[in-house]
Design a protein with these regions (language model features):
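Alpha-helix N-cap/helix-start motif
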Residues: 41-45, 88
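A beta-strand edge to alpha-helix "cap/lid" segment located at domain peripheries
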Residues: 4, 13, 35, 49-116
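Short, low-complexity N-terminal intrinsically disordered segments enriched in polar/charged residues
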Residues: 1-30, 115
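A short gly/proline-enriched turn/hairpin at secondary-structure junctions
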Residues: 33-42
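Short, flexible segments with low predicted structural confidence
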Residues: 19-20, 40-41, 67-68, 74
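Low-complexity, compositionally biased segments
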Residues: 7, 20-23, 41, 96, ...
């Protein structure tokens, strides 16, 4: 499977940075899974959009893709997240898409020590 992850990552992070919860959720498969850094798993667009709506109501960090690597239907993205307090926090997102190009699984990792 050949998939344009560069385009998908741009769309995903543009939606995140605009605080567009519905736009983010639309990128997921109906039964997509979001795995948070603490291991919590959210399944289905309804649960995922509610999570992003909650996050968007708060002061949202601003992630930027530093680099990514894709292979088939999977992609690993190294992120640098600008936090509301001005610090920068390394993170990584691991995506898997289905045959329709929708996110079927996203696992988020966050480094607990901000960069200086």
């Amino acid at each position: 499977m050949s998939f344009d992850f560069e385009k998908m990552l741009k769309t995903y992070f543009d939606c995140v940075n605009r605080q567009d919860a519905e736009g983010v959720a639309a990128l997921y498969a109906d039964d997509g899974v979001l795995i948070l850094p603490d291991g919590t798993q959210l399944q289905g667009r309804t649960a995922i959009v509610e999570f992003y709506r909650t996050v968007c109501k708060q002061s949202v960090p601003a992630p930027r893709v530093a680099s990514f690597f894709a292979n088939g239907n999977q992609c690993a993205a190294e992120l640098l997240v600008s936090m509301p307090d001005g610090s920068r926090q390394p993170a990584a997102d691991f995506f898997r898409v289905d045959a329709a190009g929708k996110i079927e699984r996203l696992r988020i990792y966050v480094c607990l020590k901000p960069e200086t």
